[in-house]
Design a protein with these regions (language model features):
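Flexible "cap/lid" loop of the alpha/beta hydrolase fold
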Residues: 91, 101-142, 180, 207, ...
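Catalytic active-site module of serine/aspartate enzymes centered on a nucleophile-bearing elbow/loop
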Residues: 228-278
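The conserved beta1-alpha1 loop
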Residues: 5-11, 35, 79
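Active-site loop/oxyanion-hole signature of alpha/beta-hydrolase fold enzymes
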Residues: 38-74, 91-92, 115-123
Length: 278
């Protein structure tokens, strides 16, 4: 039996996965939705001391409370910022993770914070500027206000999200602690050895399978490991909130990812045999 651990990003909580979790459970999977400290229905625990280690421990505890005898395979799904505590937890418990899923998320790098990666790798534009200004907007130096309804509409990449789902997002969104975004993540080679799946939301997004294949073909060192046959990929023609816009399709994608399905990239690395000169 497979257990899915679903980790949401900033401003949200386990509630975000309601419809996806229902779809996974109807297919016979076990589902755990992680709410990170200071977010969602745990917003009352927010404080200036919350950092990335806090959120990594949140996810680690969810994994530790899944009985390995009953459910040996854990598929860990990190969405948006949620990939950072997910990768950190996978680094602590690699033996429990059968697959790590990057759901429309960055690819965390050892020694970088989320803010570091945005600053160095995100294309210039309003989205980058808004993310980098989060610390300046934080109330009391640590609490980042949740977007207003107008801000969700203007900047949330909500393609496919219904008015009812948007109203729910606006009602339940919580402020986010600033500390986790600025803390550098530490990742060992244990994470690199895990099977992975990347899911790209392509409507309004900046990456898809074709673009990634072009990067691999260019020889960019950062992405060459993604041509590993254990790495699979899916494109979803929706905006940044697939659990709200297309929950049934997302549940199907996650089930297929757990089964090892998905697109595989072609490696550009070739082996050349050489012998002694004649």
């Amino acid at each position: 039996m497979t257990a899915f651990v679903l980790v949401s990003g900033g401003y949200t909580g386990g509630w975000l996965w309601r419809d996806v979790a229902a779809g996974l459970r109807s297919a016979g999977a076990e589902v755990h939705t992680a709410t990170l400290t200071g977010l969602g229905d745990r917003r009352h625990l927010a404080g200036p001391g919350i950092d990335l280690d806090t959120h990594i421990e949140d996810v680690t505890q969810v994994i530790d409370h899944i009985d390995p005898d009953d459910t040996p395979e854990v598929v860990l799904v990190g969405y948006c910022y949620g990939i950072y505590p997910s990768v950190g937890a996978a680094d602590r418990r690699p033996e429990r993770i059968s697959r790590l899923v990057y759901l429309d998320s960055p690819m965390p790098q050892d020694g970088y914070s989320m803010i570091d990666q945005v600053r160095e790798q995100m294309p210039a534009g309003p989205a980058r500027d808004r993310t980098l200004s989060q610390q300046e907007r934080a109330e009391d130096g640590w609490r980042i206000p949740a977007p207003s309804l107008a801000e969700w509409r203007a900047h949330g990449n909500l393609a496919g999200v219904s008015d009812d789902a948007l109203a729910r997002l606006d009602r339940l969104a919580s402020p986010a602690p600033a500390g986790p975004y600025a803390q550098k993540v530490r990742i060992s080679e244990a994470v690199a050895a895990l099977p992975t799946t990347g899911v790209f939301c392509t409507t309004g997004g900046t990456m898809d399978i074709a673009s990634l294949e072009a990067l691999v073909a260019s020889g960019l060192p950062l992405v060459q490991h993604l041509a590993d046959p254990r790495a699979t990929f899916f494109d979803m023609a929706t905006g940044h909130w697939p659990m709200l816009s297309t929950p049934e399709e997302l549940a199907d994608v996650l089930l297929r990812a757990a089964a090892g399905e998905g697109h595989r990239l072609r490696s550009t690395v070739t082996t050349v045999a050489t012998g002694d000169p004649a």
